[in-house]
Amino acid sequence: MKTKLNELLEFPCPFTYKVMGIAEPQLVNQVVEVVQRHAPGDYTPEVKPSSKGNYHSVSITITATHIDQVETLYEELGNLELVRMVL
């Protein structure tokens, strides 16, 4: 994935992922599990339900150390079965 993020960010820096997925109890745990593999830390994600309650938005902020970490997390979060979109 070619991005210009590397030109825009100065590492280390805070970086927030917003993950939209199906409203299942395990969604948040799966997101945190993936993030922990690449950026270990103590996370308290912010979860917001959609207006109809079918989807949840999970926001989680990491301290990114390099562009490869950012891109790998985008890819792995997007590959989760319950996830529909990662911003």
Curated annotation (Swiss-Prot):
Transmembrane feature ranges: none
One Pfam family here: DUF493
SUPFAM superfamilies according to UniProt: YbeD/HP0495-like
A GO term from the CC aspect: cytosol
HAMAP family xrefs: UPF0250 (MF_00659)
Record family assignment: Belongs to the UPF0250 family.
UniProt protein name: UPF0250 protein YE3006
Source organism (scientific name): Yersinia enterocolitica serotype O:8 / biotype 1B (strain NCTC 13174 / 8081)
